[in-house]
Amino acid sequence: MNYSALSTDPIKQKSDCLVVGVVEGKTQSAVWTELDQQCKGVLGKLLSSGDISSKLATTSWFYPQEGGVKRLLFVGLGKEKELSEAGFRKAAKSVMQSLSKSGAANAVVALSSLTLNSLKAGWATEQLVIALESACYTFDNMKSEKATPTKVSQVKVAGDKRDKSAIEAAIAKASAVAKGMSLTKDLGNLPGNVCTPDYLAKQAKALAKEYKSLKAEALGEKEMKELGMGSFLSVSAGSDQPARLIVIEYKGGDDKQKNHVLVGKGITFDSGGISLKPGEGMDEMKYDMCGAASVFGTLLALAEMKAPVNVVGVIAAAENMPSGKATKPGDIVTTMSGQTVEILNTDAEGRLVLCDALTYCERFKPETVVDIATLTGACIIALGNHATGLLANDDKLADALLAAGESTGDRAWRLPLWDEYQTQLDSNFADMQNIGGRPAGTITAACFLSRFTKKYRWAHLDIAGVAWTSGKDKGASGRPVPLLTEYLLGQVKG
C-alpha cells in the first residue's frame, strides 16, 4: 500500500473514492458542506432520510454525477462531542473494511472531517493506516488458490498544511507497525508442522539478513544443556523437534543505552504433553507461539522505522508432545538459576521454558525485561478477549506499558503480584511446583516467573485472550505489537 500526505482541498483531487465523516445533527464539516452544495443538496436529504447514516461506525456509499471523485464513502461518527479515541478506532476499522472490499484503486481521506474533539491528525492517521492494513490482510500461504488481492493500492491523507509533517511521520510509523503485525500474524497462522522451533530460528536469521540493524543467533539443545536449562529442555523432551533459544538483537541506539529485552514464549504446538489436552480445539494450540511471533513483529517494526533504541528479543521455542521420553507429572527439574521445580502438570509448560529464558536475560544487563506469552486460560476467564493481562515487579514499567496500550488501543489490565499468592506454589519435594491450583491462575503463573526476575525490572504480558480469534474469523491478531512498539519508542532517550 502506498500512503502519502496531502495538504490541498481533498474535493479537488481526482480519485476513485473520497472518505468523509458524518456527525449527528445539522452542523457538518466544511468538506461535507462543499460536497452537498456540489450535489445540489442531495446529500443533506439522504442524511435526513437515513440513507446516509451518522451512527457511529456505519458506512454509506454515494456516487456523484459530477466532479473528479467517482465514489463518496461516508462514515458515521455519532455525536460530535461524544467521539472518543475508542469510537474513532471503531469508525476507522469500519470505513477501511468497506474501502478494502470496494472497487476503488485509490482513495483520499478527508481527515478534517474525521478528527473531532481535538483528536490529533498524526494519531488519527496512525489508526487509519493500521485499520486499512488489517482489513487488507489475508493468509493464503497454504492454499492452492490465492485470494483476490484488494484493489485499493494508494491512499492520500488530506489534512491541514500545518499537520503535513505529523501526518507523514504517522504514515511511516503506522506502516512499520502494520508490517510487524502482519509478520506476527503470518507466523501465528502457520501450522505446527511448518512452524517448528528450527523454522523460527531460520526466520530470525532471514530477518537479520534483511535488516542490517538486526543480528540473530540460535542456541541448540547441546548449548542449552551446557547452560543448565533443565526446565526448558524438559518441555521438548517428548518431541522429535529440538528446542531452540533464539536471540535477535536490534541496535538502534548508541553504546551508552541499555538494552530493553523482550522474551517471547514460542511453543510451536502445545498438545499438553503427558497431561494431554482435550482434542476439541487442539488445532488452535499452534497459536501458543504468538508471544514469540510478537517479538519478531516488534523488532521488524523498530528496524523498519530505524528507532533509536536498543532491544534484544529472546525467544524460547519448543514443541510440547507426549512420548516415551516425555516429562511426566511428578518429575523434578533444575532450572538455569539453580532452583528446582516439581512438574505437576506438563500442560503448564510455558513457564518452564520462560523461566530459563528469563535467567538467560541477565547477561544483557537490561534496563527492562518484558515477557509475552499465551500463558494461561485463566486470563481469558478474568479478562475475556479484549485486554492483555499485565503483572510486574516495577510500577513505573507497568504504568508505561498501560499508557502505551491506551494510546494504541492495544490495551492491558494490571493484576496484583502479591506475596500472598506465592505460597500456592509451595512443593514438598522441590523449591516450587509449576502450578498453583485453580484460584488466581494468571497471578500464580506470574508469581512463578517472578522468582527468576530478581535482578531487573520486569513485566509479564499474558496474551492468551487476545493473540488470536476463534470461529469463522479464526486467525492471529498481531497483538500486542502496537503496545510493545509504542512502549519501546517511549524509552528513547532525549
From Swiss-Prot:
Binds 2 manganese ions per subunit. One of its GO terms (biological process) is proteolysis. The active site is at 277, 351. The keyword Transferase does not apply. One of its GO terms (cellular component) is cytoplasm. Mn(2+) 2 binds at residues 265, 270, 288, 349. It is found in: Cytoplasm. The keyword Signal does not apply. It catalyses: Release of an N-terminal amino acid, Xaa-|-Yaa-, in which Xaa is preferably Leu, but may be other amino acids including Pro although not Arg or Lys, and Yaa may be Pro. Amino acid amides and methyl esters are also readily hydrolyzed, but rates on arylamides are exceedingly low; Release of an N-terminal amino acid, preferentially leucine, but not glutamic or aspartic acids. GO terms for molecular function: manganese ion binding; metalloaminopeptidase activity. SUPFAM superfamilies: Macro domain-like, Zn-dependent exopeptidases. PROSITE patterns: CYTOSOL_AP (PS00631). It is an enzyme of class 3 (hydrolase). This is Probable cytosol aminopeptidase. It comes from Hahella chejuensis (strain KCTC 2396).
